[in-house]
């Protein structure tokens, strides 16, 4: 599966002049090597990290933590934020703060925190759990899941220590235009790159 993606990664690297991250099906340091040589700037792992936390260490030691994003899909179950794998289909035994601390200890460079409860709803990011996670570790946290308005981005950056915010549907369906969001956030004093 991974090797079918190599042509796509190479094509993106040739045609896009911004850093990009590749994930899905990455199980070994060799997979990472192939993707980085193909042009990926960073890689992201999720299920394979949970199933084999030493993979985080192996990747970090061989390629540097700066290229490793550990993606963490979470859902609130009976008041506890649990970690899920396999595209959100399978609950793990990990509570989110416990897992991100393990990921950081093993060498994760960043955490991509996706609230499955909020994903696609456009009702705003999960601010409380994002803040709890960001305060529990010393690596960057990217919030994901729920963005619906420009103010949602302002809120996640002012009420949490999240260093980034990921959104998809609001951009795909032109609910928010990226230049407008940048203008809004800049005018509110949020530093952007």
Regions found by a protein language model. Give the residues of each.
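Short beta-strand/loop segments at the ligand-binding rim of alpha/beta enzyme cores
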Residues: 15-22, 65-69, 80-87, 136-144
